[in-house]
Amino acid sequence: MMPGSKPGKKRGVLFDVDGTLIDSSYFHALAWWQAFRREGLDIQISAIHRCVGMGGDKLIEHLVPGCTKDIQEDLKSAHGAVFSTFWPSLRPFDSARDLLAACSGAGLAVGLASSAQERDLDVARRLLDAGTSIDAWTSSNDAEESKPAPDILLACLDKLGLSPADVVFVGDAVWDVLAAGAIGVPAIALTCGGISEAELREAGAAEVYDNPRHLLENLGSSAIGKLGA
């Protein structure tokens, strides 16, 4: 639908994109690792991966406390440049498109609550090829503060014309779960981004599934199924 449209549906599902619908979390970790190396910073890639899902500014501050603004901008620019070289390797997770279609077919508004850069989100949307199943989407341009702050979820809700009480959020990172919890939105977490079920549940996930296909197979009994009931 988009841009800027409100579909008039009374309930909806918000989806994170990277690591949730698109198999990209480890590519992001590698892109950040290379960006840090370019600045002479030796950051363990496992530590980087655990921060993927945060906004770039918060990821850098978490891994390199006290990093200057200039270096932070250089790191973000380098990450974007390196990540773009991985675009041809990106793939949607199995059944990601079908999951979006099933939610839309159940009469739910579907929003991509992504804080990705606009050009990265364009690539992801083309890969998903979900057409009219998606009612609204966001990018990093739509939020003042990045995850785990809930700004991007609130921006997506605004585009859908819904409130936090009307939706469920699906993500793959601890930061997704925390962002949802900050505004009282139930979070369904997927482990396909590389974070364990235990960590996601500890962060507050209401339900945990392996990947989009696993969630789709259990959609009727999930929090999403209850929304559409």
Question: Could you tell me what each predicted segment is?
Answer:
Residues 20, 114-116:
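Conserved phosphate-coupling serine/threonine residues in phosphotransfer and NTP-handling enzymes
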Residues 86-90, 115, 186-187:
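Short, flexible loop segments at the rims of nucleotide/cofactor-binding pockets, characterized by
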Residues 6-106, 122, 130-131:
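N-terminal helical cap/lid subdomain that shapes the substrate entry/recognition surface
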Residues 1-11, 104, 117-229:
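Asp-based, Mg2+/Mn2+-dependent phosphohydrolase catalytic module
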